[in-house]
């Protein structure tokens, strides 16, 4: 494990072991986007393992356009005080000062998120400089390993946020899983070439090839709107689920939230899945990913 970049003697930076351990505690759970303390309480009551505090869910960000930034500190603190479960908040890609502010507010995790407008199109945040663990998105294994090398303690497959269309989430999860399986079949000398192709450090590539999994927790996100969506992503190898617009843009948020939590737990039991899928009211209308122009796709942000 690489702890060379994470000295903790000063007390100001957390070790990789501690940060990754905090993310591990969320495994098997659902993390829900919330915009008010009331929504946060609904999410907690439904069984969410954490909430993501933000001013606009991805569907609204997509619809309204403009520059999307870190949420107001008052709003984040209101949600922190409303619930007992961990609270995450989003910072723009590369915006290390937004991350510094979020850490000072006492959030439990920071999501360096492509849902917000990137602040830097060259650099991501140096996440080793922070005590708080970071979550980052990835569409493939190379992207995931680059974020881990920068200090990310959890990876989420990106999907396409704010659409209610799960197709990109499945594409990204399958890509990460397929590339890991390919690494496992390579010889030691072939891993050098693979590291170059993935644009990732050789040591991390070897660690993944030997373990058959990422060295951090892997969640899924982007377009999950039904219990069946959540269960499918778990069956594809996700260790937990982020749900954004899919809950509070639906007809009965409390019931849908509880159903998605149950589906994530019992993801391989079709009888339970059939039961929790009944009578949920209308799902979010959503957008077909194929109808979104390439420059408008949030998953393309990040490098």
From Swiss-Prot:
It comes from the Bacteria. Keywords: Lyase, Pyridoxal phosphate, Schiff base. One of its GO terms (biological process) is amino acid metabolic process. Pathway: Cofactor biosynthesis; pyridoxal 5'-phosphate biosynthesis. The keyword Nucleus does not apply. D-glyceraldehyde 3-phosphate binds at residue 174. CDD domains: pdxS. It is an enzyme of class 4 (lyase). Catalyzes the formation of pyridoxal 5'-phosphate from ribose 5-phosphate (RBP), glyceraldehyde 3-phosphate (G3P) and ammonia. The ammonia is provided by the PdxT subunit. Can also use ribulose 5-phosphate and dihydroxyacetone phosphate as substrates, resulting from enzyme-catalyzed isomerization of RBP and G3P, respectively. HAMAP family: PdxS. In the presence of PdxT, forms a dodecamer of heterodimers. Belongs to the PdxS/SNZ family. This is Pyridoxal 5'-phosphate synthase subunit PdxS. It comes from Mycolicibacterium paratuberculosis (strain ATCC BAA-968 / K-10) (Mycobacterium paratuberculosis). The gene is pdxS.
